[in-house]
Amino acid sequence: MSSSVLETLSHELAAAAETAGESVVAVHARRWLPSSGVYWRTGLVVTSHHALTHAADITLVAEGGKQLKATLAGRDPTTDLAVLKLAVEADLALPAFSDTAPKLGHIVLALGRSRNHNLVASAGIVGGVSGEWRTPRGGRLDQHIRLSLDLYPGFSGGPLVDAQGRVLGINTRGLGRGRPLTLPLATVNRTVDELLEKGHIARPYLGLAMQPVSLPESLRHHLASSVSSALLVIHVEPSGPADKAGVLLGDLVTEVRGKSVEDTENIRDLLASDQPGGTVAVSVLRGGSPLKLSLTLGELPIR
């Protein structure tokens, strides 16, 4: 690649960062380093849920050092998104949004605001794009977008932008065990709409922790079952839905709503369209004997 091409690309990326950066704010809602946010719609900022540890006192710092107060409109830990409402009207630039999905290998920029409120950027490529993905807490992402770039502390809640400065989504380290990923536009917009309507998103909650285990051949033969694995209950939340249904520590969960379950992802998929208050049939093995329980779903607490 010639030096003139590289220089042109460099200027284009600098212009993209400058343009998109007008919509990026620092979000002061935790004790140390601020997180980042994006002025998403008129009067609204989107940021990361996990960075809001002091949600009762939120200060935003925009381009040029402009300080703004904001209140929490809603948050969803399952997608690590939060929506903030500005206390007063502000003359902030709205971003341009991309009308095409990111593709593997595309050059992208992650933007944020530093401790000193300067615009900062990290460059890289889209490292992977796959279909719909369930987060570890049960949220649904329309795409799983992995990044091959460094997402430095304070970048969560900031935008991923293309080489033209158009927003592709919101970056976070709060999902995927600390690995950087991007929440796609469709996911962000759907979540924002729900949070503005209800303040939170109700997710079903079992109130237990489980891990996959293999079933001994002798037990499978005794039960005349072809199921080779189940979920061992390693924790039951006191007074939670599973506790009230009679689930005990050490039970082996084999079926939920008549469907075999071999990992927790199976359960998240089975309950994806359920609402708190609904009931599900849960089949367990206790002391080698099958047992059927009726469990009333609770609501996933915001943490």
Task: Kindly give the residue locations of the regions a language model identified.
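Short, small/polar residue-rich loop motifs at catalytic or cofactor-binding pockets
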Residues: 31-34, 152-156, 230, 239-240, ...
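Conserved active-site neighborhood of the chymotrypsin/trypsin-like protease fold
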Residues: 3-5, 21, 26-120, 144-145, ...
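A structural signal for short beta-strand/turn segments enriched in small hydrophobics and glycine
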Residues: 43, 105-111, 160, 165, ...
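C-terminal cap/linker of serine protease catalytic domains
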Residues: 1-17, 114, 163, 167-228, ...
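PDZ/PDZ-like domain micro-motif
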Residues: 154-159, 216-224, 237-255, 270
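Residue-level recognition of beta-strand microenvironments
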Residues: 42, 73-75, 129, 150, ...
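Active-site region of chymotrypsin-like
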Residues: 21-23, 82, 86-95, 120-178, ...
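Conserved PDZ fold ligand-binding element
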Residues: 44-46, 168, 242-265
